[in-house]
């Protein structure tokens, strides 16, 4: 199955995102922002046991999901940035927490045509392709339609380094 592939290592180096989106219901949509947030929370967030970001949110917009990951309820979020300030690792970037939410539908159903985000990314950080999850190459599946290349943080990595 083809997936939207995002190379966060390339994407995060870009100084000014020029990616366009063709999301039908909202032409001013910035779908890549929601994809980057989703991928970052799933692969880079440290998922702290105490989770200061969750405790700092006055609107209960963040919570720990049953799988241990931190989840943001976008309709509760007022973009106050308290989670960003509280994150001890600086993982929650303030520009990832917009008040107005954008959506990505991964352009499901656009067969034979590349999504506008892929064709408009000047750094080639996005692609649609058949790809296998490969932990040794830092390629992770996030959800059903997204594959991400990034350095994933894990508690196991830190325990190995301490020894």
PLM features per residue range, with description:
Residues 1-63, 76, 86, 158-163:
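Ferredoxin-type iron-sulfur electron-transfer modules and their immediate structural context
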Residues 40-47, 54, 75-163:
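Flanking helices and flexible, charged tails adjoining ferredoxin-like Fe-S electron-transfer domains
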Residues 66-68:
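Short glycine/acidic-rich loop motifs that flank beta-strands on beta-rich extracellular proteins
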């Amino acid at each position: 199955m083809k997936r939207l592939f995002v190379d966060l290592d390339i994407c995060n180096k870009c100084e000014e995102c020029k990616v366009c989106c063709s999301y039908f219901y909202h032409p001013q949509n910035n779908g890549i922002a929601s994809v980057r947030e989703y991928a970052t929370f799933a692969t880079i967030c440290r998922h702290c046991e105490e989770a200061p970001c969750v405790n700092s949110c006055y609107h209960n917009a963040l919570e720990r999901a049953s799988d241990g990951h931190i989840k943001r309820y976008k309709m509760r979020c007022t973009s106050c940035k308290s989670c960003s300030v509280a994150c001890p690792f600086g993982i929650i970037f303030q520009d990832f927490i917009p008040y107005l939410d954008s959506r990505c539908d991964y352009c499901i159903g656009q067969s034979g045509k590349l999504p506008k985000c892929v064709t408009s990314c000047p750094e080639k950080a996005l692609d649609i392709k058949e790809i296998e999850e490969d932990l040794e190459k830092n390629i992770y599946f996030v959800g059903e339609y997204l594959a991400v290349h990034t350095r994933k943080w894990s508690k196991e990595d830190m325990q190995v380094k301490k020894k």
